[in-house]
Amino acid sequence: MPLPCGGAIDVCVLPNTQASVLRACHDQLASRQPVSITLSDSGSLGLGHLPTPGALSFQYIPKLRLRIAGRGADSLALARLATASGIHTELQLRDAAEAQDAQRLGIERVTTLTVPSALPKLDDDPWTAFLLAVHDVDWEETLLAQALIGPAFYIGAIGSKATHARRCERLQTIGFTKRQTHRIRGPVGLIPSMRDASSLAVSVLAEIVEAYQRKVRYPLSSTALALLADMPNVPDTHLFQSSSCTNA
């Protein structure tokens, strides 16, 4: 079915779809786990990527989730924009009044931070982006240290280049490696040095969405495959960047 934009949609009607497979797919996605469904040439569905000749495999990925820890206009502006974009957003705020403002904006998950030594339990997953906007050294170090031990695909912290360099140095003095602190993005945003809270929110959210789409499209982009082969005039070891395939 061609579309005016130049794309197309293929429609496949399965009159006797296995409801159990669809329920299992839904439940796995609801638990924040990626899942695949395989459609055989006979029209039957199977859960998972099944190596069946002629079959097609469709992968479904958990939606982007955003966790923001901070205070002030930067945190609220980003949370408001992300929520309006349909992104599941969690706010961790130090100020009780700001927490009430966030709830009035329609943000359901709002936690008030008390002391750096008693952080909320980490529940990030590989589809979670974390942004720090605290502007306090003690809180900054503790929150980033917690995020770094988790699986979030994006960790960002608001601040200048000099501020970012200092925060990474502090984290390294408490045991994190340079490779680990390299996960932290700073300064954040596609457009550098944004001062207005709303403009900064647009810049940061665009960077987060870009990182999420890159993870979805190229899930093995950071994985390497070492191929050892005895081939004349070719070095023994070659390093290839892995890619994904949608055909079963």
Kindly label every feature range from the protein language model.
Residues 18, 75, 137-140, 164, ...:
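Alpha-helix N-cap/loop-to-helix initiation residues
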Residues 50-54, 118-119, 175-176:
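Short, flexible segments with low predicted structural confidence
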